[in-house]
Amino acid sequence: MLKNDLFLRALKRQPCSRTPIWVMRQAGRYLPEYRAIREKTDFLTLCKTPELAAEVTIQPVELMGVDAAIIFSDILVVNEAMGMDVEIIETKGIKLSPPIRSQVDIDRLSVPDVHDKLGYVLDAIRLTKKELDNRVPLIGFSGAAWTLFTYAVEGGGSKNYAFAKKMMFRDPKMAHMLLSKISSVISDYVCAQVEAGADAIQIFDSWASALSEDDYREFALPYIKENVQALKTKYPDIPVIVFSKDCNTILEDIAATGCDAVGLGWGIDIAKARTILGDRVCLQGNMDPTVLYGTPEKIKAEAGKILKQFGQHTANSGHVFNLGHGILPDVDPANLKLLVEFVKEESAKYH
């Protein structure tokens, strides 16, 4: 039994004594303890060494007191498992080769056995679960098909997604073929993470805001829905969070994927999101990550405002406090610790 199951209770919209908190990228460069490990190894080796991945996954639980751990990995491990060469240089960016821009390229990508090609992530989950010893839940995750598609077609990050959109608009059938292939791997991967011990899954659609509402409905949401349904068919009790970055205008469509929680960017007042969605899903978010550069007073004021905007909890409401995107690498860890402690203390009165 979990000693602290607040995060899972909130996702399932069950009564909680306070609002749980974790933050995206909580295992990362802002922590000196993480940097000490990273100095000895490169990023992908860290992802692929279960003992090290488990160690950095647990660091924020022990150092910051967050209510959930998220497995240390990267969304691009899926692209690599499908046969792409992935280079991640933390300060310089990402390169994937060869870029996928033709039918021949798509055919060349494999649909791997995730237990084989992504076994190191599953091993890291098993080891982390053991070392967490039921202190807090463990989140598994994957990138969404649209985001992994853009990386595959662009061959890296992009400002305007020209190659990805060219394929979408010139040959939508080919685009859907690639999206579908990626999506099938994601479905297998998230199910395998749950088999290995993940207590919840988050799907990250980091480049969601690159698409118009209609294009998002056509090229992104159907695949997220496919992934959620694949997981729910096998593991109906495992909660799923969908984080479609900055898609604040189509929250109802995101909720309609069947997810348990919708991750919010900081561009929307959480009260407005709750009005739109009612309490049919849990809401996760949504403080601007740069607030953590502020004074202790400012951090508390902003966090307090979000808790107040969400308002009083009902018998079937859910809120997981988080940032609207990942914590930035040059944030003072003391500021995150202050945020975590403040949310734990301040949120109780709303429950």
UniProtKB/Swiss-Prot annotation:
Pfam families: URO-D (PF01208)
Keywords associated with the record: Cytoplasm, Decarboxylase, Lyase, Porphyrin biosynthesis
Molecular-function GO term, any one: uroporphyrinogen decarboxylase activity
Site residues (Transition state stabilizer), renumbered to this chain: 74
Reactions it catalyzes: uroporphyrinogen III + 4 H(+) = coproporphyrinogen III + 4 CO2
Protein purpose: Catalyzes the decarboxylation of four acetate groups of uroporphyrinogen-III to yield coproporphyrinogen-III.
UniProt-recorded name of the protein: Uroporphyrinogen decarboxylase
